[in-house]
């Protein structure tokens, strides 16, 4: 729980939907601070968190299942507006005395609702008789409304697609306004928070910056703090924010594992030492990391080897910093949400997480996580607010294990150098074409596959380079980017001509799912 007493805020009750985070992102985009908490922790949350409005998320359960999650009755006794989305509408109706039954037909995917009555929830969409495209995902449906509710909109499969008790300001919608497939869903959510709940939308990065600085000073006092710097956006923004708060009480430790992009280590050192004058310990551990990776070809073993060694090197260097009492990490809000998710339960490990979980317990450092309230796009906005170069905060995501997971097979110094050059050429051509900011992530992969080629009159037998570029909003799903062919042609020609060791270039047109964005 964060200190947000100076902000109007919304409580989002999570019933296990895969897209609950999108509700929070839409609200934050409209300047409304919100927090997500699991349905079974709500009563405890309400003892300290005083929401101005409540949103009940969707979820995979049926209200007819034994021990199905139910909305706490306390939520309807707060005298604040409540919006139930999909399962949230169903559990609200069930708790308030309505009726929910299994649907004879299910609604999944694109659908249309017909507005039959005006409501401030749907202001700006159209009056009675207007049809609005939405995204449905439900099997059960409400068949009888609780007392005080009226129908606002219907759909082919749901007679109560939108319902409202205007007196108590309780609303239910059977579709998902938070997803991009509901084109004007953000407007519906804004109507709820701004028009119905009367919120001003005062959540800005300028306000967050001022409050975060005050919190850091209060937490750290005159203590010393260590920040692990990876060169990525999250740790860099955290470091600059902390330095603004406490100055040279901060020391950054930059462990260079030799697996960064071309010239990236030098850029990080220059920016933090010369531009921001932040005390920085630069550890060139490339030889140590590459030595540990010799002979390793399994992707998960690579990740674990890099993670283990990173902790060892960081531990070794941090121990040299006298009087350190705090450790700063760039934890983001999605990490916090997942740790207390209503979904819970075991899940398959697709890939171990990029980030290191912290230092060994014996170091007794207290954790400082100044970004734990923020989503990735908010971190970028905060970086701009703090004066970080836009080209830096706008960089594409880069994995913690670095180029090691973009080199299938054994990672050697020679293969790293080849990939660094190919990747730099690829990104250079993307920037020249003005496409960099239209792409979520772009990178080159060096494959452990050799092919025959011809250079001049000579035969070559070199490795293949795969180029990858995807569009996405959150990294959970992704589509391959449809380049103009001349951009790919220029990149491929330059790579083959300028990078010794590559004689063939291919483009990856796999979406996620079924593939992942990274190759390993």
From Swiss-Prot:
The keyword Chaperone does not apply. SUPFAM superfamilies: Adenine nucleotide alpha hydrolases-like, Class I glutamine amidotransferase-like, GMP synthetase C-terminal dimerisation domain. ATP binds at residues 230-236. Residues 203-395 form the GMPS ATP-PPase domain. The lineage of its organism: Bacteria, Pseudomonadati, Pseudomonadota, Alphaproteobacteria, Caulobacterales. It is an enzyme of class 6 (ligase). The active site is at residues 86, 176, 178. It comes from the Bacteria. It catalyses: XMP + L-glutamine + ATP + H2O = GMP + L-glutamate + AMP + diphosphate + 2 H(+). Gene3D superfamilies: 3.30.300.10, 3.40.50.880, HUPs. Pathway: Purine metabolism; GMP biosynthesis; GMP from XMP (L-Gln route): step 1/1. GO terms for molecular function: ATP binding; GMP synthase activity. This is GMP synthase [glutamine-hydrolyzing]. Catalyzes the synthesis of GMP from XMP. Homodimer. One of its GO terms (cellular component) is cytosol. Keywords: ATP-binding, Glutamine amidotransferase, GMP biosynthesis, Ligase, Nucleotide-binding, Purine biosynthesis. It comes from Phenylobacterium zucineum (strain HLK1). Its EC number is 6.3.5.2.
